Amino acid sequence: MKTVSHVLALVLLVPCAAPAHAQIMEMNGSWELNAAKSLGPSPVQETLVFEITPGLQRYTMTSVDAEGGRGLNEWEIRYDGKDHPTRTPGATASVRRLGEKTEFVVNMREGRITSTYTRVLVDDDRTLISIGRDGEGEVLWVRVFEKQ
């Protein structure tokens, strides 16, 4: 948990230093949720898949909750910090880089922020920490994913 606490503190203090258009290529691949290392509510299973090419991020999230319900979220958007439509009607997402190993995602529906994620690569790019916030900026959860 020390790593999660240190990363959370760092993410909240680091200024935006990297260009918004420079993707974090080390995020490419599949990531599995480690629920035991995560904080706050989380599904029993969650997989993130990133396919990043210059200027574009393809993202797929699949999950299973405690009741067996399945979740799916996916997009293919330019990595430029601007709002782009997702596959959910009325929803947009934007992705921008905050630092060498940190990106910031804003999800909106009908022009209102619904959630944000700060994603940080740690442990030699083998661990991805995702900090989820609601539309008002309150931290909902900190999820730890391991590279597959």
Which residues does each predicted region cover?
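Bacterial N-terminal signal peptides
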Residues: V7-C16
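Hydrophobic small-molecule pocket/channel-lining residues, especially in calycin-type beta-barrels
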Residues: A22-Q148
